[in-house]
Amino acid sequence: MPFTLGQRWISDTESELGLGTVVAVDARTVTLLFPSTGENRLYARSDSPVTRVMFNPGDTITSHDGWQMQVEEVKEENGLLTYIGTRLDTEESGVALREVFLDSKLVFSKPQDRLFAGQIDRMDRFALRYRARKYSSEQFRMPYSGLRGQRTSLIPHQLNIAHDVGRRHAPRVLLADEVGLGKTIEAGMILHQQLLSGAAERVLIIVPETLQHQWLVEMLRRFNLRFALFDDERYAEAQHDAYNPFDTEQLVICSLDFARRSKQRLEHLCEAEWDLLVVDEAHHLVWSEDAPSREYQAIEQLAEHVPGVLLLTATPEQLGMESHFARLRLLDPNRFHDFAQFVEEQKNYRPVADAVAMLLAGNKLSNDELNMLGEMIGEQDIEPLLQAANSDSEDAQSARQELVSMLMDRHGTSRVLFRNTRNGVKGFPKRELHTIKLPLPTQYQTAIKVSGIMGARKSAEDRARDMLYPERIYQEFEGDNATWWNFDPRVEWLMGYLTSHRSQKVLVICAKAATALQLEQVLREREGIRAAVFHEGMSIIERDRAAAWFAEEDTGAQVLLCSEIGSEGRNFQFASHMVMFDLPFNPDLLEQRIGRLDRIGQAHDIQIHVPYLEKTAQSVLVRWYHEGLDAFEHTCPTGRTIYDSVYNDLINYLASPDQTEGFDDLIKNCREQHEALKAQLEQGRDRLLEIHSNGGEKAQALAESIEEQDDDTNLIAFAMNLFDIIGINQDDRGDNMIVLTPSDHMLVPDFPGLSEDGITITFDREVALAREDAQFITWEHPLIRNGLDLILSGDTGSSTISLLKNKALPVGTLLVELIYVVEAQAPKQLQLNRFLPPTPVRMLLDKNGNNLAAQVEFETFNRQLNAVNRHTGSKLVNAVQQDVHAILQLGEAQIEKSARALIDAARNEADEKLSAELSRLEALRAVNPNIRDDELTAIESNRQQIMESLDQAGWRLDALRLIVVTHQ
């Protein structure tokens, strides 16, 4: 290999060193200085892993002074090159630049430059890059993008709401599903879609203080969204880093109390430019026209500043009309400004609901009914649709569905309010109560008597709380180490129950973490029962491990012992047996406990076991919950209302459980209230709203489409290939789970999402739902998205060379495989990828420019090729460089036609869809005031910007592979 002092070469194995200069040559060795790093390398002359850097006419080069030049001519003299061309800064022509003065920091980014500079990738990396481009483009085009990656069951009504709301510009909606139907999941799905598509980047979630950790866990575990929890301490810390502490994080959770307590803090929240605000338990925001509460005013102030708002609340019937109006007023104060007018409007929706019911019943419609439908929809062109709906043809059902959609679009608050009920959603289990009455031990009787004497001055509420937990009273006098479990009959009963139901997974819930820990020790030491503990003192990772151990079928824990707070936000649908070791203080907490098992998708009826001690507050509460509210065996939407109305009486009975006079009357009174309120709620059900929120067949089809996508084997093959190339170790753990750990040879030192200890993953949704320690891998998981970014944002796999053993072709025949990318640049929030994601166009050219890509499929062709080592590859490239240049020019001439076709198709699709959506909403605006002006303005503005961006779309060469035919 001829070396001359001053020549520029690049290292094949250490390209990061930049351009090297030959500074010494002797008979056997050559020394290169790499000025950008100041390092020297000594190579053997005969077989050195370096490539001569030679630019060609048309290339742009940079001098060591920083100016650039377009090369027009290359001269060689005594082995040294001089480039002649035009300077780009001064436009001076005929400028000469000797190669010794080239910029040493040169990085070859174009695939052809990397190939000619000897920066040749492994063949499998080229294949991975092409697949990454192909799959990435396909995923952006999926109609349900953003709905597949969450660790949740595919529940149609949840998917329907998320699909509808998640695609809107700055959605402002009220989610008012009944308890247990998954409002939190719906909100998470909407957030996930908006964040993934770029429609939103900054999100604020405001919740009651007790639910902060539940939301934190739920967002992370189900949606891979890592929120920061802001409290007083975190807020104070962040003040050192930014003028507005909330600017330090993109995703924030804080409590309502934290938000409203300080005027400055609320101002900072309002100024933080959030894209989405989520408020949980919004029904607790007290409002009246004359005196709105401070909490309501705080949220109102925020809602004025934040474009998108999701309010999670109890059902409208539970709230009452005025309270319901107050929530809607937060979403759109211009639309909902007059309560009396709102009440009148609601009455007028009855005929619409009747019309929808009529269509869904499938009966033939009379002429009067057809005319009424025509008037309600108010459009001239629906006559054919009405006729089709009333015919016996195959199209009748779809015509009826379309008419139902039109009616719901035009009437009611269906664009801003979503509400599902258990009656309208299938898939809930039965709940069966088993009460176990147990004698009150003498030790407790004594402790209670002494406590009564010593605590005579305590309030009735404090005495009532004490009486719910007699073991705590006993420990107050005997010390924290007192062994109450040795004589408490509930412990004996629990051990007996567990030993006789060894094959059952049992969830045991008690109020205090200390109780859970003591029970675990007793079960382990006395009966060898495997019990996991779950309480608020544990970290999220520790809780995950406990939950995973409980979920293991054969070797896992039989029992999970949970404290009240520790179990918030966790669901254990694989178990159907629950033991309440004690009872919570109010009906909301009781429903929350049962809700750990009573979820959609629960396969078995739920067995609720309540061992209680007679003559204690537990015996009072168990009767009140069961006989007064029917709260164990059915959800109890009336519970809180009745609890508040009888609070004082109930507290007195709990504080003095031996005073039972009048208690039967209280229970009877509560039961009557419960039945009356229930009937009232049923009467007030908005059938029209339920039909819209539920989604019907459309929602079912959406769930089935995603389920089909879950079975896509392409993801598994691609992910394994990706992990191999990044350098991630994979260890099959069985049960459809894989453990990933970093290796010593990673493509990047710290791969986002992969901890030093490794992570457990699964591609199976069912496994992910049962095992909280296993991350659910989909195309939307950060691990895959980060992997795609790592490959596609750099030059991994962008240039390679392969051998094709084919005796039907002459030895030395050249083929060049080109991967172009057609793309447009636009702000992320425009979601341009819906129409034109970066799209690969593959060409396989021979030396005459014939494109063989259509005849030769990529994967089949890839399997026929053999790899070449980098050194041999560099020699081959140098030998055929001129031919490759010629083929590249033929490729450039051909790509324009293919790229233009893609861009035109994207323009037509964008124009058609966005114009249709705008026209639809403008037409609806005339009959349904729930369509906001800012939504129409945003769609029109987005349409214009998207069309402009598509007009500027272009293409570039992303990767190339040189193929040389051989017969050996």
From Swiss-Prot:
CDD domains: DEXDc_RapA (cd18011), SF2_C_SNF (cd18793). This is RNA polymerase-associated protein RapA. Residues 490-662 form the Helicase C-terminal domain. Interacts with the RNAP. Has a higher affinity for the core RNAP than for the holoenzyme. Its ATPase activity is stimulated by binding to RNAP. Residues 164-334 form the Helicase ATP-binding domain. PROSITE patterns: HELICASE_ATP_BIND_1, HELICASE_CTER. ATP binds at D177, E178, V179, G180, L181, G182, K183, T184. NCBIfam families: PRK04914.1 (NF003426). It is an enzyme of class 3 (hydrolase). It comes from Escherichia coli O139:H28 (strain E24377A / ETEC).
